[in-house]
């Protein structure tokens, strides 16, 4: 029970911080944190909640299938299946899914992936080579969540990572809440920088294909 309260507090603090950045517009987005490994349980945001508010009903505890562990009238976030795929296939401890203007714009500029390089902040992703290059996959959105989940699952590689969904934000996971938030901040910085650079240069660069 102590671990549950500790993780609840941790997730609540992340929600507050990301809310101040307006990364949960119009109740969008969902975040989760692992509570136990065996059996697998994790806290996830309840569906349809205004994340600018803090209430006792912000999160609910679910199992490895995304089913509530305790009796509740709350419904887990619609994209819970993305979180279950990550927790069931990695040792990740936290998953963050947010919608921002920048990450949505990026998915309209590129088709299957966006390539970013030569930025010091890439080191926040535990990539230490000078002039490092990263590729972030982009998948098509799908209103049928199980289908979206299968597309997403193919790109889960390791205990940390990120996947962009066309016009549907980014999902980032990490070893724990600190790692996941750090990675999310790094990706959003890179997107913002890249878009500003393109606006100055006047077009899509880095040899990637534009999407239309």
UniProtKB/Swiss-Prot annotation:
Matches recorded under SMART domains: Aldolase_II
Listed pathway(s): Amino-acid biosynthesis; L-methionine biosynthesis via salvage pathway; L-methionine from S-methyl-5-thio-alpha-D-ribose 1-phosphate: step 2/6
Keyword Cell cycle appears in the UniProt entry: no
Record key words, sorted: Amino-acid biosynthesis, Lyase, Metal-binding, Methionine biosynthesis, Zinc
Cofactor: Zn(2+)
Catalytically driven reaction(s): 5-(methylsulfanyl)-D-ribulose 1-phosphate = 5-methylsulfanyl-2,3-dioxopentyl phosphate + H2O
Domain of life: Bacteria
Pfam families hit by this protein: Aldolase_II (PF00596)
GO CC field: cytoplasm
Leading EC class: lyase
Gene Ontology biological process terms from the UniProt entry: L-methionine salvage from methylthioadenosine
Protein residues bound to Zn(2+): 97, 99
Family note: Belongs to the aldolase class II family. MtnB subfamily.
Task of the protein: Catalyzes the dehydration of methylthioribulose-1-phosphate (MTRu-1-P) into 2,3-diketo-5-methylthiopentyl-1-phosphate (DK-MTP-1-P).
Name the UniProt record assigns to this protein: Methylthioribulose-1-phosphate dehydratase
Phylogenetic classification of the source organism: Bacteria, Bacillati, Bacillota, Bacilli, Bacillales
Primary gene name: mtnB
């Amino acid at each position: 029970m102590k671990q549950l309260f500790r993780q609840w507090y941790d997730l609540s603090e992340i929600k507050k911080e990301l809310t101040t950045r307006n990364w949960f517009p119009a109740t969008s987005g969902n975040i989760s944190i692992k509570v136990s490994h065996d059996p697998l349980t994790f806290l996830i945001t309840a569906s349809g909640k205004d994340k600018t508010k803090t209430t006792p009903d912000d999160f609910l505890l679910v199992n490895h299938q995304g089913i509530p562990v305790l009796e509740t009238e709350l419904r887990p976030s619609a994209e819970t299946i993305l979180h279950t795929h990550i927790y069931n296939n990695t040792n990740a401890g936290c998953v963050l899914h947010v919608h921002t203007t920048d990450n949505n714009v990026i998915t309209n500029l590129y088709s299957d992936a966006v390539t970013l390089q030569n930025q010091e902040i890439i080191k926040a992703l535990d990539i230490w080579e000078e002039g490092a290059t990263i590729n972030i996959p982009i998948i098509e959105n799908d209103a049928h969540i199980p289908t979206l989940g299968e597309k997403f699952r193919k790109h889960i590689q390791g205990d940390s990572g990120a996947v962009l969904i066309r016009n549907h934000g980014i999902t980032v996971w990490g070893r724990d809440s600190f790692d996941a938030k750090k990675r999310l901040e790094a990706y959003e910085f890179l997107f913002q920088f890249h878009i500003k650079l393109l606006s100055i240069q006047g077009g899509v660069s880095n040899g990637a294909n534009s999407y239309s």
